[in-house]
Design a protein with these regions (language model features):
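Membrane-interface extramembranous regions
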Residues: 2-208
């Protein structure tokens, strides 16, 4: 796109259109990610995979019946079915918690998406998105598995993120998106109120 424009007003309208599209696309993207990941929480392999995060979190570990690090003896590889491990996870409330978390995640994504049409609903979703991603980022502090372990190699601990850590750190971008959406929805509501106020004042002046 050229850096100069013969019609600044036209270019400004174009930029505003691109911005609106980007904001709405951000909402759709958040919905897709949250609906997909939230839906996967209903499946055994995904429920097993989040156990290290939940078990080590001071804010979430109470949802489980077992204490960390007992889970390390009962982790299933993705795609594997080990009946003894699955039985342990049932006793731990691994699957019950995962179902509830999945429902919450899908709900947040839906609220964010509805913000396209209803900014007040969007604000609720935006705030929950920020809170959810903040909780996810806290796993970098509470979950040992987010860092490369010391197995004799030269690279371990901070700043060497493991596969789990690399997955978690991406939520910082999702959090930034939440703040952008929150600011956008607040601005929309305030603009609507100001517009209504001006219309009311105009009507009063005309009547006088």
């Amino acid at each position: 796109m050229p850096t100069t424009c013969s019609s600044p007003e036209k270019c400004l309208r174009y930029a505003e259109t691109v911005q609106r599209f980007g904001i709405n696309f951000l909402r759709v993207a958040v919905f897709i990610v949250f609906a997909w990941i939230g839906g996967l929480k209903a499946f055994q392999y995904e429920a097993d995979g989040i156990v290290p995060f939940v078990a080590n979190s001071p804010m979430m570990s109470f949802f489980y019946n077992k204490q960390a690090p007992e889970y390390k003896q009962h982790m299933n590889k993705e795609g594997a079915v080990v009946p003894a491990n699955i039985a342990w996870h049932r006793e731990n409330n691994t699957y019950g918690f995962s179902y509830g978390l999945g429902t919450l995640i899908v709900s947040i994504g839906t609220l964010v998406l509805l913000g396209i049409f209803f900014p007040k609903v969007g604000i609720i979703g935006d705030c929950l998105l920020i809170i959810m991603t903040a909780g996810t980022l806290s796993f970098l502090v509470t979950t040992p598995e987010t860092w490369v372990p010391n197995l004799g190699g030269p690279n371990h601990g901070f700043p060497y993120l493991s596969g789990a850590g690399r997955l978690v750190i991406k939520d910082i971008a999702m959090m930034a998106g939440g703040f952008i959406l929150l600011g956008t929805d607040l601005k929309r509501i305030l603009k609507a109120r100001l517009s209504s106020s001006k219309e009311g004042e105009s009507c009063c002046c005309n009547n006088n």
